[in-house]
Amino acid sequence: MENYKNKMLTPKERAKDLLERMTVEEKTGQLNQRLYGFRIYERDGKNITLTEEFKEEVKRWGGIGVLYGLYRADPWSGRNEENGITNELSREAYNTVQKYVIEHSRFGIPMLLASECPHGHQALGGGLLPVNLAVGATFHPKLLSKGYEVCGRQLASGHVDLALMSVLDILRDPRWGRSEECYSEDPFLSSQMAAAAVSGMQKTGVSAVAKHFCAQGETTGGVNASAARI
């Protein structure tokens, strides 16, 4: 048995053996998150089929490192109740995608799944919290932590590994179109709320990706993704 398959060895020993066997392309594939998950499938009723775009990506990199937004549903993604992944279909969809990735990876490496969680899970049937700006006005970190425990359990039920959480931005310019993602203009209050949100999420076993680092809120003229004034 190859060392990377030997569960009696430490994770470090298994990873070392696996890395020594992988090509540069395969390693690169494990480090990127460029594919939009909401573009990798087509839904016909309750049937989920994988797109050629997804299959070509797996083939190019010998696997998928992180898949972003499989469950995302909003005007930007173009997914809704008619063509998106509902709670009812989430298990089948995840299993279909993960099975394909594992079977088409030379070493059977499973993908990680990342999902947007700006104020709750951004998905069909996702539980939502008030926007961050409203939550910041409560000055109640403990309550926020409990809210994210609920969100975390929902993400975990959908096999989500990474929750992308907008918790670090400081509101400097109210013209910015994403001001509601900030807890406050005050760094201390924002830090307390961010710590509470991350703590609540990670109690469920889902890893929190705290964003945006750094200075996304320091926009020029309030224009999103413009030059940042640091």
Walk through the language-model features, giving the residues of each:
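Glycoside hydrolase catalytic-domain context in secreted enzymes
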Residues: M1-I230
